[in-house]
Amino acid sequence: MPGRLGGSRRAAIIAIGVLLGACPVQAQPAKPAPSRPNIVILLADDWGFSDVGSFGAEFATPHIDALAHAGMRFSNFHVAGSCSPSRAMLQTGVMNHRNGLGNMPETIPDEHRGKPGYDTVMNHRVVTIGELLQAAGYRTYLTGKWHLGSDAARLPHARGYDRAFSLADAGADNFEQRPIEGLYDKANWTENGKPATLPKDYYSSRFVVQRMIDYIGEGRASGKPFLASINFLANHIPVQAPDSDIARYSAMYRDGWTALREARAKRAAALGIVPAGAAMVTMPTTPDWRKLDADERAAAVRVMQAYAGMATAMDREVGRLVAHLKAAGDYDNTIFVFLSDNGAEPTNPFASLRNRLFLDLQYDLATANVGRRGSFSAIGPGWASAASSPLSGYKFSAAEGGLRVPLIIAWPGHADIRAGGITDGLAHVTDILPTLTELAGVAGHGGSWRGRAVEPITGRSLVPMLKGGAGSVHGDAPLGYELSGNAALFRGDYKLVRNLAPTGDGQWRLFNLKVDPGETRDLAAAEPDRYKRMLADYRTYAKANGVLDMPAGYTADEQINRYAFEQQGKPRLIRFGLWVGAFVLLVSGLIWGLRRRRRAKSGWALSRR
């Protein structure tokens, strides 16, 4: 697509820069340390803001919490509202409309397909952290969910990873090699670009950690430092966990999601993650726990127990990895980054009778089986509101519950990073790459890579914040965001936000996140000048990044349903129709044959008379 990076248009775009949210700021490489650090990225899937013990969760995450106490917690860290855009920004340090993920394959409207920035895969105009560190002499490994492209030229082994065992899809079963039924026809696991088969004792969190431990061990003789990116499937739909982990929480969650949301808010405030007494909204999509019947409550309690068990199972694997690195003598010289790709998942896959009937044919949906092998479950909007506590909204929306997630950065053997520190300065997922390259003493690409122009890194190094010397590296600079029509503009302590249906009404609202992280008090009328200025900033950002308006009537949920029908529903209907047609032809042929025989016999009998 030469128009984006060639000729006068390229010059104009880079001159504008990604003016608000994409201002090219290249970290200055630090002097190489005697021994360059290893880097471990722990990417959780669909974990809400308070889904970690050190951010307010009631379930056990002791190993992730240990990293938090060894490093720094970022309580004002933002990603995209859904997975692929966040993952591409994490990989490249480039905003999503410039890295190809202006939207995802499952949610893009037909009108946007093929437009600049709307590739629905990570494009080749960006450079990954794997490519940068690989070129600098690092061993580079990735295990788990990829979801940035499924063809050979876009899988991890072609994007800077020496070895990779990855899932190309948005999600899959956690106990067997099985896709999310109705969305994909198979679970597309590959190793180094070739189709791979999972072991019989597979459980997702255990497997992706063990495969990474194997990779690290097999490459140790080289003496090179390593980048280990572990992309967990937990806690994406389907929510599944080992029986023992579910049983651990058998006495919990009987008071419902509203009580849990309130309890988490109090814990988060006590931990210093949010201001004391921060107000919360009651989301209109949250069901009234008191109106559920006994069976509905039992099913809801069970799925949250499974969700908690799934998180604890993942945390245990983090602990196993850390123990391995300690035993190998690597722990003190390893930088750990823990984050989630977006907020908690609110989807209720059983909301429609059609989906319920389909899933009932594919899975064992009995309450006693929730979370186990052969089950399909999701926490829905009620528990998602608790997972996002005390924020408003969840995955897919541009509200804080969709964009703000836990971030932990630790380097246990490095005194410059404040152990146990918490910062509420604004940080963004594009900031991770320049942070890690600076800490590793690796130069960035400066917009040119192997003789060709590429998108400049738009994130800013968080090293000043890690050292305790800056409130936010973004200062008062505008930082823009858009996905599926849901949009935001951050500037200092303030946020301008718009959510389309079904999570919003399409109106812009203004909030001071410093004192109101729950987005409860719209300041648009009280601060009209700031509102107008930030709206102008957003429009500049949208124009500079090629953001397209959504078609009338668009909703991400409906688009996902269309995608599922096109990918699975229509082919299944066609196959069913062919089967029925073949059956009808067969029966018709048999009937015709029988009638012909009868006629033949009748004719023979008449001829004998």
Language model features: what each stretch is:
Residues 72, 147, 194-195, 200-205, ...:
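C-terminal accessory region downstream of the catalytic core in glycan-modifying enzymes
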Residues 49-141, 159-163, 169, 173-174, ...:
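Active-site segment of extracytoplasmic enzymes that catalyze sulfate/phosphate-ester chemistry
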Residues 53-59, 73-97, 101-107, 142-154, ...:
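Short, solvent-exposed turn/loop segments enriched in Gly/Ser/Thr/Pro and often Arg
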Residues 162-163, 167-172, 373-403, 410, ...:
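C-terminal cap/loop subdomain of S1 sulfatases and analogous C-terminal strand-loop tails that border
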Residues 152-160, 240-241, 323-411, 418, ...:
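Histidine-centered active-site microenvironments of extracellular/periplasmic hydrolases
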Residues 32-38, 90, 150-174, 205-281, ...:
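Active-site regions of oxyanion-processing enzymes, predominantly non-cytosolic
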Residues 29-37, 44, 49, 73, ...:
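Long, internal low-complexity/basic segments
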Residues 11-22:
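Bacterial N-terminal signal peptides
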